[in-house]
Amino acid sequence: MAGILRLPDHGRLIVCTDLQGCLRDYDQIVSIFQRHMRETGGDAHLLFTGDLVHGPHIDPNDWPDFLGEFYRDESGELMRKFARLRAANPKHVHAIIGNHEHGHIGGPHTAKFAADEVELLESRLGPDQTAWLRALLRELPLCAIAPCGAVFTHGAPAADIGSIGEVEKARLDGLHFDSPVDIFDVPVVGPLLWARSAHTQVARRFLRAMGGTIAIYGHDVIPEGFERIGDEQIVVSTSFGVFDSNKVYLELDLAGHYKTVYDLRVGQEIRPLYPDKAPRSLGGNAG
């Protein structure tokens, strides 16, 4: 079963999207989380919204601007560090599954930066580490919810559901595809892992079923850092495909309540990953 992560009604929540093997950005968000753990006496949480793995293998001279800041894929080391961090902070470090992780445990294999990114990463890891990675990924839930009204998915909230039980009962394994595009026909799992947009009415029905008011997700790249869609949806780009100056993460008050995504304010809930590089329009210190 896919499962749902239920966050508490107290503390701070740091939200990071789409690292895709960028270890430098992972280390930066972890340092932010650790600072909040110290400031709150341990009442902080860190949530990754999927796609921690599968980055580019491109030389600097061939790097295109549309991929944002240059980096080299370090998916294996990133996942090892995530596992150690989660073990050191039980019930405080979380991740939900993204479409790139899903490929390792039954989903279609992605081919963004290689003919088969699943095969490439697993060949680099070797048999033992591959078995370890698959076991880790099978533990990840499909969605996360919080009493503050936030519902977290990897892709857009485009699953047309009537109850939270439909998400809880969704299967991530045992799927068979004649073509990778067949995933779009899989109820619940297909749209929540692959959709880049959701019609307003579908998003509202999804949020009602999940008991939330706002949907927070990544998956798509927003070069400006984030995009609000109506009152219910916000797409956040913390890492992949974005230059350092525009990378943002979220800092939420789990004891609060967010009625619309416009309750998420730049410089408060919406924060720059690298403040010294970010413009003031994103809450940064640069001119």
Predicted regions and their residues:
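Active-site neighborhood of phospho(di)ester-bond hydrolases with catalytic His/Asp-centered motifs
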Residues: 15-17, 46-51, 94-99, 152-153, ...
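A short C-terminal boundary segment appended to hydrolase-like catalytic domains
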Residues: 268-287
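Beta-strand-turn-beta hairpins that frame and shape the catalytic cleft
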Residues: 5-14, 145-151, 231
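Active-site neighborhood of divalent metal-dependent phosphoester bond hydrolases
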Residues: 42-43, 52-150, 158
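N-terminal active-site segment of His-dependent metallophosphoesterases
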Residues: 1-73
